[in-house]
Amino acid sequence: MKIRLLSVLVAVTFTFLSNSIFADSIVATYTCKLKEGKKKEDVQAVNSKWLKYVNENVSKDIISSFGSAVVGNQDIFMFADTYPDLETWAKTQTALDSEAASEIDGMFEDVSHCSENRLWKLEPTK
């Protein structure tokens, strides 16, 4: 059930992200679980801070989406961070390794645990 749910979430995310405005995009996906006593709103608040940081310090073209389960385990969720190209993704990783961004990383660890991640290149079907 867990694998089916994850497959559905990934498929829905890719369908959404495969629009022409995301042609040849780089997408980082993270499969995560809420820590005990935390809510999705807690994670979304931290993710908003993360997005604001990368938009201000790297590129305004970075988009982050939060995927929650429609059915099944509501504690499992995913992030899909979309970058216009691999160079922007690499610049983001460098920016996130800075001391200024370490506080945001700690905030994620306080509310969630991410067990999987993947970096995808999306190409439109012709």
Where are the regions that the model predicts?
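Short amphipathic alpha-helices within nucleic acid-binding modules
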Residues: 40-42, 84-95
